[in-house]
Amino acid sequence: MAKSSRENGPREPAAGGSLSGTRESLAQGPDAATADELSSLGSDSEANGFAERRIDKFGFIVGSQGAEGALEEVPLEVLRQRESKWLDMLNNWDKWMAKKHKKIRLRCQKGIPPSLRGRAWQYLSGGKVKLQQNPGKFDELDMSPGDPKWLDVIERDLHRQFPFHEMFVSRGGHGQQDLFRVLKAYTLYRPEEGYCQAQAPIAAVLLMHMPAEQAFWCLVQVCEKYLPGYYSEKLEAIQLDGEILFSLLQKVSPVAHKHLSRQKIDPLLYMTEWFMCAFARTLPWSSVLRVWDMFFCEGVKIIFRVGLVLLKHALGSPEKLKACQGQYETIEQLRSLSPKIMQEAFLVQEVIELPVTERQIEREHLIQLRRWQETRGELECRSLPRMHGAKAILDAEPGPRPALQPSPSIRLPPDAALLSSKAKPHKQAQKEQKRTKTSAQLDKSPGLSQATVVTAAGDACPPQGVSPKDPVPQDPTPQNLACHHSQESLTSQESEDTYL
């Protein structure tokens, strides 16, 4: 990888030509010019001054390009209801994924509570299972020296990742250190793939929500399951998806498709950073998080939908095309998108309503792959098949996998915990009494049918294959108690979903 190519930006193809994509051509973000200037803000000598800066709810310095203005706050009671429902799902994840996956998808579309977002991403992506299947693997990779040809490139990229965020503002700070560890570990885990610059913002977003080891396994899942081949040497997968996006655009917005065709603008010029960074360097931060919530649940179709929505609203009407008379003006229009179309509520609603399915994407993928093979030959990168979301990843998991062991998240007051512990012996005594009564009936009635015995013992012993309900994890620390006092039950048959 040419280390200086990032500063030069992407090369525009000649009219009618095609762009031979390489991962060195990833465009530099709009804030990269000021990243070098701001990277010294967090030096050790200025650490004391950092506390005086105002930080927004997402961790960005107020007034910086990453920070957002006034946001619509979710009422506290609504947030507590959301947390309670998500805690129930996470603590019974396998059951929910098996029987109520549509409900999980609906709640991901409505937004994961911030306090549980990192944990939910781990469960949705399968990163939690990968971690349990590979205990100590990250530590082993972390202790290894790494390949020198990648280490220097990674180190040069560290200060470019969200330099206005409190985690990454300091050179050599804990955020940059963890980012280096995660990216280095991936080059050792997949030495044939190495490092691509677009992996850095993906890993940085993950580190904002979880520790380094968990972020590493989520990154593995993104690279291998959600976006396989995106970060390979020749960027063949991203080129194919560019053609898929352009073909789908013809159905979603014929006006935008016709304009881009007339201008002979290669899809790689506007969608490379969108797709490879999962819009982490494009959208306002609140929109990024909502898009990622849906992406981890539903897969790459969310990335396609977001791209199509942006193209449709940026170039989808004659009025908007008046200012786009040439290639340069069109590219600038797509690089400086209107804040309205990127606003969280508007964008998410448009993405949910856009009728683009996995089947359409896969059908178009086969068409574009056939064209590629006819004109360019076989793909050099043999990546794994793409998994369309959390359910597909779970279903494709080979053989028996370890049951997810949720960390205790439900907190009960000390009195409630004491009552719960006192109630257990009483319930066990009742069960023993029922078993004794059933045995006595058998002794007195030798002709009692087997069906009658099963019916009589049904209350005492659950049927085969149905496990008794797990006890609620207990923690004597009475913190955040109000989050778990909701009278609603996720296992009940609700007439309508009260999750707002």
UniProtKB/Swiss-Prot annotation:
According to UniProt, the name of this protein is: TBC1 domain family member 10A
Q: Which domain of life is it from?
A: Eukaryota
Main location class? other
Q: Which organism is it from?
A: Mus musculus (Mouse)
What Gene3D superfamilies would the database entry show?
putative rabgap domain of human tbc1 domain family member 14 like domains (1.10.8.270), Ypt/Rab-GAP domain of gyp1p, domain 1 (1.10.10.750), Ypt/Rab-GAP domain of gyp1p, domain 3 (1.10.472.80)
SUPFAM superfamilies xrefs: Ypt/Rab-GAP domain of gyp1p (SSF47923)
Kindly list the residues the record flags as site (Arginine finger): R156
Task: List the PROSITE patterns hit by this protein, alphabetically.
Answer: TBC_RABGAP
Expression sites by tissue = Expressed in most tissues, except for skeletal muscle.
